[in-house]
Amino acid sequence: MPKMKSNKGASKRFKKTASGGFKCKQSHLRHILTKKSPKRKRQLRAKSMVHEADVKLVVRMLPYA
C-alpha cells in the first residue's frame, strides 16, 4: 500500500506538541493593522493551540506528525 500524503498547507501551519496537541499562529496580523491597538497586535503574536474539536481534522491532514 502506498504512503499517505500529508496536506502540505497544514504541515506548514501546524506543529505537534509533545502532549499530542497542535500549535499554530494566530490570524488577523497580516493587513489592516492601523486600527488595531498595539496591545491587540502584541497578543496576536503569541502562538495558540488548535481547539480540541478541530484536532481530529488536523490529525487526518498530517498522518505522520
From Swiss-Prot:
Q: Name one GO molecular function term.
A: structural constituent of ribosome
Show the InterPro entries listed in the entry: Ribosomal_bL35, Ribosomal_bL35-like, Ribosomal_bL35_CS, Ribosomal_bL35_sf
- The residue ranges crossing the membrane are none
The alphabetized UniProt keywords are: Ribonucleoprotein, Ribosomal protein
Q: Which intervals of the chain are annotated as region Disordered?
A: 1-26
One GO CC term on file? cytosolic large ribosomal subunit
Q: Name one GO biological process term.
A: translation
- One Pfam family name from the record? Ribosomal_L35p
Q: Which family does it belong to?
A: Belongs to the bacterial ribosomal protein bL35 family.
What NCBIfam families does this protein map onto?
rpmI_bact
Protein name, per record: Large ribosomal subunit protein bL35
Q: What is the lineage of its organism?
A: Bacteria, Pseudomonadati, Pseudomonadota, Gammaproteobacteria, Alteromonadales
Identify the gene encoding this protein.
rpmI
